From Swiss-Prot:
The active site is at 77. Pfam families: ArsA_ATPase. This is ATPase ASNA1 homolog. GO terms for cellular component: GET complex.
Length: 380
């Protein structure tokens, strides 16, 4: 795994086009082990926008519903594409997905809400001391909201929860929240000890002893909560992250950033789904050269013209197909070289239609369980 997440050269790998990949991969190229791991409680699905995170998270949830007692698919992406994927309206309350009796979905907003339990009346100077101190930590408002959200999720009685997350940048901010809370709340707890004498004097002058203690009870509660969430995040038996990408530069680059950040935070990640992959066409007896030889045997000029037009169009399509495969092979090779020793890399084919509706998502979910070689292009 490369070291410098911000360095473009960290993703530079030699491109080998020696053979169309038929060799054994280092890890199984499917998600069977993920689905069969019954100890997992939280599965996060993340990556760059537009790479198929929602389709992948929905598919994982469908497969888990076959193995687990109860499954919740939870969308934290502000776009909330889960409703569109299933052609069913979901809200911020768990709703059974049509045709299931154990698979639920809900869509929530992870942005800061004024309803957070730490809300304190700002009109009173004494009560505003703690919020003002908290605001000196950028992002603490969202972090507090996130902590309460994760605590309520932790208390939900589902066998496993699949998180359909927002694009990478937003997800990285969410992952940073437990550390931010630990730092901010730890600072306030230490501050109380250092200023104990001053606070006692203020309490005696203002008769606000109960309010001070109430504030610090909340701080201690939030601190305990954030530690619990962080422990859950860092327990590989309970939590894992599935990275989703496509074989293009920006997507592979963001995947590397995400994996490096997960590694720094000790969050388990051992599955990568690569969507929109162009696989080899299986048609050994059909090629342009044979068509051109056949054209020479045709005597009728009208048929010749029509057939020649078809050959020219086929050449154009073949050029596009080969160019696409060569480009994808460059990034598939990078993915394989970077992660082949550590990850289950699942390549999913470019499909002809959008994946919307239960039937299409179910078909896609079955493909996630089928092993496929990473299709590195080679000229014949």
């Amino acid at each position: 795994m490369s070291e410098g997440g911000s360095d473009v050269s960290s993703l530079s790998c030699s491109l080998s086009l020696d053979s169309d990949s038929c060799e054994d991969e280092f890890y199984e190229t499917n998600l069977n082990k993920l689905i069969e791991n019954t100890s997992l409680n939280w599965i996060f699905v993340g990556g760059k926008g537009g790479v198929g995170k929602t389709t992948t998270s929905c598919s994982i949830a469908i497969q888990l519903a076959k193995k687990r007692e109860s499954v919740l698919l939870l969308s934290t992406d502000p776009a909330h594409n889960t409703s569109d994927a299933f052609n069913q309206k979901f809200t911020n309350k768990p709703t059974l997905i049509n045709s299931f009796d154990n698979l639920y979905c809900m869509e929530i907003d992870t942005t800061f809400s004024e309803d957070t339990a730490f809300k304190i009346n700002q009109s009173n100077f004494l009560n505003s001391i703690i919020p003002e101190l908290l605001q000196s930590f950028p992002g603490i408002d969202e972090a507090l909201c996130f902590a309460e959200l994760m605590q309520s999720i932790k208390n939900m009685k589902y066998s496993v929860i699949v998180f359909d997350t927002a694009p990478t940048g937003h997800t990285l901010r969410l992952l940073a929240f437990p550390d931010l809370l630990k730092k901010a709340l730890g600072y306030l707890i230490n501050l109380k000890e250092k200023l104990k004498g001053t606070l006692n004097m203020l309490q005696s002058l203002t008769n606000n002893e109960m309010e001070f203690e109430g504030m610090y009870d909340k701080i201690n509660h939030l601190n305990t909560m954030s530690i619990s969430i962080q422990e859950n995040f860092q327990n590989p038996l309970k939590t894992t992250f599935v990275c989703v990408c496509i074989p293009e530069f920006l997507s592979v680059y963001e995947t590397e950033r995400l994996i490096q950040e997960l590694t720094k935070k000790n969050i388990s990640c051992y599955n990568i789904v690569v969507n929109q992959v162009v696989f080899p066409l299986i048609c050994p007896d059909a090629n342009i050269e044979k068509c051109e030889n056949l054209l020479k045997q045709i005597k009728d000029t009208n048929i010749q013209d029509s057939f020649n037009t078809l050959i020219l169009k086929a050449k154009e399509l073949e050029d596009v197909y080969i160019s696409r495969r060569k480009l994808q092979s460059k990034y598939l090779t990078q993915i394989k070289n970077l992660y082949g020793n550590y990850f289950h890399i699942v390549c999913m084919p470019q499909l002809k239609t959008e994946i919307r509706g239960l039937d299409k998502i179910s078909n896609f979910s079955e493909m996630l369980l089928q092993s496929k070689d990473i299709p590195i292009y080679s000229p014949q």
